[in-house]
A protein has these predicted regions:
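Short, functionally important secondary-structure microenvironments
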Residues: 1-253
C-alpha cells in the first residue's frame, strides 16, 4: 500500500525528545526512521482507547504518515508535498508570511501534515480501516506536554474536523485549551475552513489535494498560524517527528 519510492525502514529503540513514539523521513537518503521508547507507558484512558478499537500497532500508522508525504497509496499520485518542487513552493509561500525560519519550517510541516494525514485517513477508510494510531500519537504528545500549546491545539483541532471520528475527539479532549484561549482557537479553526472553503466532518480531498492551490492554501494557513505563535512556542513534535526549531526533513536544502 506504500508509495512508489522504495524506502529503507529503520526502527530505533530510543525515547524521542518528547512522547514515546516518533518518526521522520528523508527523501534524499530514502530512509524512514522510527523511534520507539524501550518502555511504553499507557495510562488508563489511552489503554481503554487502544483496547476498545483493537489497536495493537500504532507504529504502522506513523510509518504510513511518513510514506504519505510523498505518495499514499501506491501509484495514486496523492501525497503532500509529493515532490521537492511542490515542497519548495509550499515553504516559499509560508516564508513570505513568517519571516522567522523556525516559525516557517514548523508551520509548513503542519500544513503538509494536515493534507497528508487527511489523505491517509481517507485511503484507509476506503479499505474499511482506521487511522487510530495517529490519534494516539497526538494523545501521547498531549500527555507529554500536559496541555497542547495554542498553535498545536489549533493544528489538532483542524484535523479533528477533517478525518477524526467522535472517539478520537473524545480521546484528545483533555489536552485542548478552554476559556478565552480555547474560544480564540475555535474561531481560528472556523476561519481556516471558511477561507479554504472546507466543510467540517468531511475529508475535503478535492480541495486539499489540488496541488495548484497549495501555495495559496499554505499562505492562508500561515496567516492564521501567525495569530497563535505569540501565545507560546510549540513544544510538541509533529507527526513527521520535527520539533520547533529543527530543520525540516521535507526541505531539500
Amino acid at each position: 500500500e506504500a508509495g512508489s519510492i522504495i524506502y529503507e525502514l529503520k526502527v530505533i529503540l530510543a525515547k524521542p525528545e518528547i512522547g514515546q513514539v516518533g518518526g521522520n523521513n528523508s527523501m534524499l537518503s530514502k530512509e524512514i526512521t522510527i523511534y520507539i521508547s524501550p518502555r511504553i507507558s499507557l495510562d488508563e484512558r489511552s489503554l481503554k482507547y487502544l483496547e476498545d478499537y483493537g489497536i495493537i500497532d500504532v507504529v504502522s500508522d506513523v510509518v504510513r504518515h511518513e510514506v504519505g508525504h510523498w505518495e499514499f497509496p501506491q501509484f495514486s499520485g496523492r501525497g503532500c508535498p509529493y515532490d521537492w518542487f511542490l515542497a519548495e513552493k509550499i515553504f516559499n509561500s509560508i516564508y513570505k508570511v513568517l519571516r522567522s525560519k523556525k516559525d516557517g519550517d514548523y508551520v509548513a510541516n503542519m500544513f503538509m501534515d494536515v493534507v497528508d494525514n487527511t489523505n491517509v485517513a481517507f485511503s484507509l477508510n476506503q479499505k474499511e480501516r482506521k487511522y487510530k494510531g495517529l490519534a494516539w500519537f497526538y494523545y501521547d504528545q498531549g500527555k507529554s506536554a500536559g496541555k497542547y500549546t495554542p498553535l498545536y491545539d489549533w493544528f489538532v483541532r483542524v484535523q479533528s474536523h477533517l478525518w477524526m471520528g467522535e472517539e478520537e475527539k473524545e480521546l484528545l479532549k483533555p489536552f485542548f485549551n478552554d476559556s478565552s484561549i480555547g474560544e480564540k482557537i475555535d474561531k481560528l479553526v472556523d476561519e481556516l475552513f471558511e477561507r479554504l472553503e472546507l466543510k467540517k466532518n468531511d475529508y475535503n480531498l478535492e480541495i486539499l489535494l489540488d496541488k495548484e492551490r497549495w501555495e495559496e492554501q499554505a499562505r492562508v494557513f500561515a496567516e492564521i498560524a501567525a495569530k497563535l505563535l505569540p501565545l507560546g512556542t510549540p513544544i510538541e513534535a509533529l507527526s513527521s517527528g520535527e520539533r520547533y526549531g529543527e530543520k525540516s526533513s521535507l526541505e531539500k536544502k
